[in-house]
């Protein structure tokens, strides 16, 4: 009863957080970057998977658990232009307190030449974002688990800097018989504590997300569906002022899409579709489509791969290597690399090898 009450309070908090915030501009948008190859390959949305992969856990803290204890994950992404970002993640489980994780994220936007209003050079400067995340997860029962993250955020752009805090809260359900996993996540609830400029507070990039995945029983497939921005219906960036709408060649009037077309476009902008194929125990292939990215980044004059992403992950004796690529626009295809180590598994293998060697010698 106590566990169900705790879960109910948590879900109510998620709903309230989503209801109480509205869309619009925000600060600290680097928090929404994908810091794991599996996340990138599956469309850069929330994923809900009950397995041994530690690389995505900081985005879904409810699945931080004992099976990932003593794991390290490193990520590097070659983004656009001079921009690169990286992260390092570690998790450990304490029997009574639960499972804890820590991650540091760094985004470097490169160096720039400063200019004054007269066009004179003022010297070079850099721009960087950093976030330190502390996560916690705990199983309430074999089927239910919860988790939370606390994020310390720092941004420095030339002489301007900002500091803020944000939290994530998540709850997950797992059915081992159906191989079904569900997660609800309230993400980036927080605010600036120190603003870039005086009296100009901006909100963090809040999102309310839901994800499900299911491993099919007789084929090596797992499908993923994730929903984002559940607190807001209209996802069209331009609204009625869209400068890319077609015009009638005779009257030069704007051709607005039908209400039905607008409805389904908005509906699918909230959904990411992903598929994992596991042809062998050590290999996973991923493919996904993000309709919102496609609509925002597509080129009208020709077909585009915008919104598609793909990748793979190798898992060999406690060592995971992952690669993913995501398409935004021609020439804008970030590459993401992941390396993850489970030190408990590596230690276990080392002990087994020593035992076999001793057995042969005796």
List the model feature ranges, each with a label.
Residues 21-362:
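Subset of outer-membrane beta-barrel
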Residues 1-4, 142:
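Positively charged n-region of N-terminal signal peptides that target proteins for export
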Residues 4-16:
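Sec-dependent N-terminal signal peptides
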